[in-house]
Regions:
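Extended Gly/Ser/Thr-rich low-complexity repeat segments
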Residues: 19-28, 62-82
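Conserved short beta-strand edge segments in small beta-sheet-based binding/regulatory domains
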Residues: 70-113
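Short amphipathic alpha-helix segments
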Residues: 12-38
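Broad gene-expression machinery/nucleic-acid interaction feature
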Residues: 4-6, 51, 98
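Short, intrinsically disordered low-complexity segments
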Residues: 33-73
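Short glycine-/aliphatic-rich beta-strand segments at the starts of folded cytosolic domains
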Residues: 1-17
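Classical N-terminal secretory signal peptides
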Residues: 1, 113-115
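A structural detector for beta-sheet-dominated domains
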Residues: 8-12, 41, 55-57, 85, ...
Length: 115
């Protein structure tokens, strides 16, 4: 079974943010010669926000890390997932997407309370 990195996304505009995220990840797939390595779920709307999950195959992230090498290693965060989250957040900011990103497993840990 393939390992995936699941990222919680919170955004005020689902269509704009999911289209932007789809564009970022499609370009990433093209860059590392992969296809169909991510999934974006439908959103749940609450309190004026859309909440959804972006699931990315870890192979895609590993290939990104290998391709950009040292600059990936210099990204903030410990480990592959955190560094990818930093890279992904930078990409969304460059596209001016108004979205908050967090690793799903961390959101569910007791460190952040009980969910």
């Amino acid at each position: 079974m393939e390992e995936r990195i699941n990222i919680n996304v919170s955004a005020t505009n689902y269509d704009q943010s999911s289209d932007g995220i789809r564009s970022i990840l499609t370009k990433l797939e093209e860059m590392v010669h992969e296809e169909n390595e991510f999934v974006i779920t439908d959103s749940e709307f609450a309190f004026g926000w859309h909440f959804y999950i972006v699931s990315v195959n870890k192979v895609l992230v590993e290939k990104l890390a290998n391709q950009i090498g040292e600059s990936f290693q210099k990204l903030k965060g410990k480990g592959l997932e955190k560094k990818f989250l930093t890279w992904f957040s930078q990409q969304t900011q460059e596209k001016n997407l108004k979205a908050k990103l967090a690793i799903k497993e961390e959101m569910e840990s007791s460190k952040y309370g009980i969910f």
